[in-house]
């Protein structure tokens, strides 16, 4: 093979591989688009379900509060009604006494008067229940929770066991579940030592924790593999306040002291041998009695004796050793930083709940309006049928796609144009009678063509014996060279081109003796049939040109075989 042919084959192979890669990439992109649409529908349904459930909870809370208002009103009303009934009863008694005293003037009513006065003194003349009633709610916290509720993630998230659970299980903070664990093994020392540390439990007003780790579920594998928390001495001892008041005092051994020669005050020199833990236990028993008798002011630093301008290396070393006891810490070092969602909370002006849609994050850029390309069908319709001539609205629409009419003007204009092309009016009635006759003749001709095609397929023996090969036939059988139409009838397809080699020998052996005898007879018969075959071929070609038979019929007609069919047809194997 020449190098030029090898190069062509290599280039062809590369082109085929590139086309296959492009087909695969196109299929992946189409699949991603379909998945994107389905995922967006699913996320919308999840969002709608979540918001609806929480709205139901909020509505239930509203109904419960309304019932509480009715209950308080009923209780206070009953109390005031009872008090009012007692006062009205006593007032009636006084009215009766006044009437009797004015008209009778008897002194026998003194006992009744004293009884009424005693009742009056025992009754409370002020309302027993106050009419005050108010509604108190932390609207700022609720508004902040609503505006920062929910996020849309566009990246693939790692699947874990916690995501397989229902989302309703995540409504309660995980912090309350963690409290059931053993605090001695899971809680670090910095959380139970005295000191200021962030509180994660919910207060009375339902101010839940803002720490996301208190709300997110943790998988079981991470809990089992979790080791004990690391202990930082500086953080633990830096938060000491009154720990020495309840911790047991440790008995320390006596250490030999050396006075500093460069300082004017007494200071304890701490050597490296003092940190030897092996010698500490031996010295504890010997120096236990003498250590308790020492005065506290002998080893404490007296800062008043130090001159301000002098720098003492021993004092610097002392400060470095006791630095954890005096070092202060800042809460901003361990508090979580604010994210983008909290920048909306820095507003000074109050926003009502109806205007929550106007809230925008300060860091979010304004959305850019997408550029929409007009549909080519709509552009063609604009050119063919102007919008001003068909639009039925009070104000002409900008395009057919944005038509505000009940029936789209574009559809009506397109249907009217199609009916006009067919020679019909807007109701579908033909305008001219000549067009109906032409249409009926055209339909009859089409029916005749279909009938001829069916006849050629169902009864191939009735068609011409050897039709002319078209381009499709020449491509399907390139090794057969066609002769003239006249010779094609005389010389049909030879069986030698189709039969098995063994069958060829048998057929050739049987035909050789009779070859000379049959030659003269064939010449005579051929001359008689030439004229008839020519007429049949012309008839066949004219029928094909008139009816326009498909090329597939021509392909199957040229594949007719001669010879005995029993010799070359496939037969099933006989069982012995």
Curated annotation (Swiss-Prot):
The keyword Nucleus applies. Its main location: nucleus. Residues 432-442 have a biased composition (Polar residues). Disruption phenotype: Morpholino-mediated knockdown severely disrupts erythropoiesis. Coiled coil: none annotated. Residues 514-529 have a biased composition (Basic and acidic residues). This is Nuclear receptor coactivator 4. It comes from Danio rerio. The lineage of its organism: Eukaryota, Metazoa, Chordata, Craniata, Vertebrata. The gene is ncoa4.
